[in-house]
Amino acid sequence: MPHIAVTMYPGRDAETKRKLALKLQETVAEELKVRKEVVTVTIEDVDPEKWEEHLERFEKETFFVSRNA
């Protein structure tokens, strides 16, 4: 607890993803006042032609930041 799931277009290497995951872990741990070790991060690549379909999996209420924000 907590878990952050990031989805993005393909094209970034593993090192870039690792750096992003570490920064997210640090920020979330600080904001939620939890130990970094309990924060997990996954990163999933989604092809551009499947992006809209992918976003439809999520309930509107779960978007706290969106393109229209």
What function would you assign to each model-found segment?
Residues 2-69:
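A domain-level signal for the structural core that forms small-molecule/cofactor-binding pockets
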